[in-house]
Swiss-Prot record:
Chief location: nucleus
Record PTM N-acetylalanine, positions in chain: A2
Phosphoserine PTM sites in chain numbering: S505, S507, S509
Modification comment: Phosphorylated; strongly phosphorylated in mitosis compared to G1/S.
Protein name per the record: LEM domain-containing protein 2
Record field: transmembrane: 221-241, 385-405
Residue segments, region Required for nuclear retention and interaction with LMNA isoform C: 80-141
Top-level taxon of origin: Eukaryota
Length: 511
């Protein structure tokens, strides 16, 4: 038993009906002891079966020839139904005690199955299992057929899966009390898959959690940032939409209007006059608010402005309330004399200024246009988008201006550097010319400015380098004492020349 590998140990335990867990160095000895106990229990059960079957074995002798004939018929039909029989035998429980044939029948039937029994005996001995001699080749024959179809089914089959019937043959159908194949293996009939799942779960638990924690933090940060941006955008929309118009507030203000009851002073007259004036102002307020809202939301009525002319407003009020023009003028007079904001502006010839008297009123405009929620949202969204675009345009303009300034500064630096390089070249040319003159290699001690330019700048670059050359000439005239600019007549023409001035070796104090 000590020489069994882990796979063989697992198969032995599964064959005896025990489902082992992971086999490691610490659990291997435990499973070996378990296998030893299970084998001992199996031997005890086999001995009990031998003692119990000793009596019924004598009664089963006369049925030996019939059993031989039935087995011969089944062997002839076995090739035709080999595949279905294998699938049936996988789930069929082993019989507890098959009816043994008579001694004479067993000796006669040992011929066809003698080789199989002899080959199966060493396997049973290596497994540590003992089978009674009277049990016949039925269980072993079933084992051989099932092993021929699948090696894995042999490992998971247990020798103690027997039906409670004592005289049931091995080819008889299983009884209702037989235990299924999956019940013997436990909840998980595939130990290899269970072990692989356990191993993967252990590997997942040992995986470092730093990356997952960082992912969770980043996802939460993005979520809160998105919610913050959404709330900010909704707040901007709400601010741009403004508060909805409140006609009830205007109506409450209108209830404070004085009533024109000059001729009639009774309470009924005053109540009627007050109700009529409130109705007129309420209708006027609604009319102006709707017209102003339509003008702001697409202007479907093609209005010139949201300031409605007085005559048009008066005609509308007369059609709706059937009130005379005097009452309309009285309402305008009260609006002008009231210090409260009723939501109606009275404008004169200049739309930017409010009228002070009824005669100067040209048009009426609502201070709180009545717009739908869709129009308010679209206007707020348009305003927000416009402001954002203006901001980005300003930002782009400033960015472009900065890029332009940086480009300009870089060009100036490059031009200044080129000017210094040109000054160095001019000094070298003039100094070399003076040295050549001292060595009688040149006729004159000076050299023409244009001659120096033509020798330093190629023709195709003179237009591009003109600014650099002019700055170099100015720099030499104002900052270089070793080069003097003079005017000489050369070849009959006056020409500006440069002369190299050699500094004296001694100062006046040394002399």
């Amino acid at each position: 038993m000590a020489g069994l590998s882990d796979l063989e140990l697992r198969r032995e335990l599964q064959a005896l009906g025990f489902q082992p867990g992971p086999i490691t160095d610490t659990t291997r000895n435990v499973y070996r002891n378990k296998l030893r106990r299970l084998r001992g229990e199996a031997r005890l059960r086999d001995d009990e079966r031998l003692r119990e079957d000793a009596g019924p074995r004598e009664d089963a002798g006369p049925r030996g020839p019939e059993r031989q004939r039935e087995e011969a018929r089944l062997r002839e039909e076995a090739p035709l139904r080999a595949r279905p029989a294998a699938s049936v035998l996988r789930s069929e429980p082993w019989p507890l005690s098959p009816s043994p044939p008579a001694p004479s029948a067993a000796s006669d039937a040992s011929g066809p199955y003698g080789n199989f029994g002899a080959s199966a005996s060493p396997w049973a001995a290596s497994r540590g299992l003992s089978y009674p001699p009277h049990a016949g080749p039925g269980p072993l024959r079933r084992r051989a057929s099932v092993r021929g179809s699948s090696e894995d089914d042999e490992d998971t089959r247990t020798p103690d899966r027997h039906a409670p019937g004592r005289g049931r043959h091995w080819w008889a159908p299983p009884s209702a009390s037989a235990r299924p194949h999956s019940a013997l293996l436990g909840a998980d009939a595939r130990p290899g898959l269970k072990g692989s799942r356990t191993g993967s779960a252990g590997a997942g638990r040992t995986r470092p959690e730093v990356g997952r924690w960082l992912e969770r933090c980043l996802s939460r940060l993005l979520l809160w940032a998105s919610l913050g941006l959404l709330l900010g955008f909704l707040a901007i929309l709400w601010v741009k939409m403004g508060k909805p118009s409140a006609p009830q507030e205007a109506e409450d203000n209108m209830k404070l209007l004085p009533v024109d009851c000059e001729r009639k002073t009774d309470e009924f007259c005053q109540a009627k006059q007050k109700a009529a004036l409130l109705e007129l102002l309420h209708e006027l307020y609604n009319f102006l608010a709707i017209q102003a809202g339509n003008f702001e939301c697409g202007n479907p009525e093609k209005l010139k402005s949201k300031c409605i002319p007085v005559l048009e407003a008066q005609e509308y009020i007369a059609n709706v309330t059937s009130s005379p023009s005097s009452r309309f003028k009285a309402a305008l007079t009260w609006i002008l004399s009231s210090n409260k904001d009723v939501g109606i502006w009275l404008k004169g010839e200049d739309p930017s200024e409010l009228a002070t008297t009824v005669d100067k009123v040209v048009c009426l405009e609502s201070a709180r246009p009545r717009m739908g929620i869709g129009c308010r949202l679209s206007r707020a969204l348009l305003t927000a988008v416009t402001h954002v675009l203006i901001f980005f345009w300003c930002l782009a303009f400033l960015w472009g201006l900065l890029i332009l300034l940086k480009y300009r500064w870089r060009k100036l630096e490059e031009e200044e550097q080129a000017m210094y390089e040109m000054v160095k070249k001019i000094i070298d040319v003039v100094q070399d010319h003076y040295v050549d003159w001292e060595q009688d290699m040149e006729r004159y001690p000076y050299v023409g400015i244009l001659h120096v330019r033509d020798s330093l700048i190629p023709p195709q670059s003179r237009r591009r380098m003109k600014r650099v050359w002019d700055r170099a000439v100015e720099f030499l005239a104002s900052n270089e004492s070793r080069i003097q600019t003079e005017s000489h007549r050369v070849a009959g023409e006056d020409m500006l020349v440069w002369r190299w001035t050699k500094p004296s070796s001694f100062s006046d104090s040394e002399r």
